[in-house]
Amino acid sequence: MGDSVACGIMMKNISICPEMPYKDSKTLLVTVYSIVFAIGLPANCLTSVLTFVQIQRNKVIAIYIFSLSLCELMYLSTLPLWIIYVQDEHHWKMGLSACRVTGFIFFCNIYISILLLCCISVDRYVALVYALESRGKRGQRKAILIVCFLFAMVAIIHSPVFSMEDNPPDVNNMTCFETFPLDTKLASFNFARFLFGFAIPFTILIFTNYKIFQSTKTSTSLSCRQKAKVKYLAIAIIVIFLICFAPYHVVLVIRSIYFMLHQSCSCPFERDIYSVFTVFLCLSTANSIADPIIYVLVSENVRKDFYRNVRRWRLNSSRLNSSINHRTESGKLKMEKESQEGVLREENKKVPNSSHIQKTCDSGKDQADGS
């Protein structure tokens, strides 16, 4: 009882939990962020190129994968800032506006990725379970409208991050979206994030992928290879969801529940759970690597397009090289020809032509007759 009272008095005098174990997670965060950036950037660039080829072939699912890769690229562009932040012992020294934009992109990336995974599952579910009914109803235009709506909705929901505290105590020595302890408003928002951003989408994923498994078992129109592809895609979606997003949201809701029950003394718990929270944060970041590797490179059509584009690039390169070599040889021959013609012109200038010789002879004859 005395410890609780003492803790409550201490919490009234401070607004930030002291002695958070930031240094313990420094190496892990910097390493994971660096690896994700080094692998995720080229992988998502490749994904966007390959899925853009699929979009040109009127593949509906390519719209969602292409949007997912663009979302990941946007988040990956902020990772160098997070690396600097962690190396500076969690002191954000790049200005309040940069913190807001970076945090906004982080939150939007998580929930846009989750919703796009749901879109991919629902699209596969409709295409397989309602194959006849969905003909002519699944189109790229509808997919684009859905993606635009999701982007706009998530952006609007997270727009309050731009109205955070305008004048923090020390702009050059502040944390960036790391609130220890939580406040009532943020804890309530975390519950909403868990329900609408994780629990409901996860329920949709389980339902649609269960129906997909049932449909592929009884389907006679799909080959064994096609059935395996559909199953792998469904398994990949669930695995990504469980590994990358589930742990982060579970810890998020645990922190919020504990704060609601122990508002006067939550700092000791925050310090104890921080290392676990950091590991799960790294898992959510690894989603930027998992998406392109599992969704695009495993796909047979995309892989064929990749090799086809590589062969086409090599063919065009060889044609370009041969054309350059041909032009070079032609240029050399032309220069040699022009050089030879120049030499002949110089020699012709030195040797008198026939008309000049005839005129000389005529003038000599006239002089002889005159004498």
Annotate each predicted stretch with a short phrase.
Residues 8-22, 86-111, 130, 136-144, ...:
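Loop architecture of class A 7-transmembrane GPCRs
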Residues 179-182, 194-198, 213-251, 263, ...:
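Intracellular effector-coupling site of seven-transmembrane GPCRs
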Residues 22-34, 58-120, 127-137:
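Extracellular TM2-ECL1-early TM3 structural module of rhodopsin-like
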Residues 77, 156-163, 199-206, 237-254, ...:
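Hydrophobic alpha-helical segments of membrane proteins
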Residues 110-148, 211-215, 296-303:
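Class A GPCR helix-loop hinge within the 7TM core
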Residues 1-46, 181, 190, 369-371:
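Extracellular N-terminal segment of 7TM GPCRs
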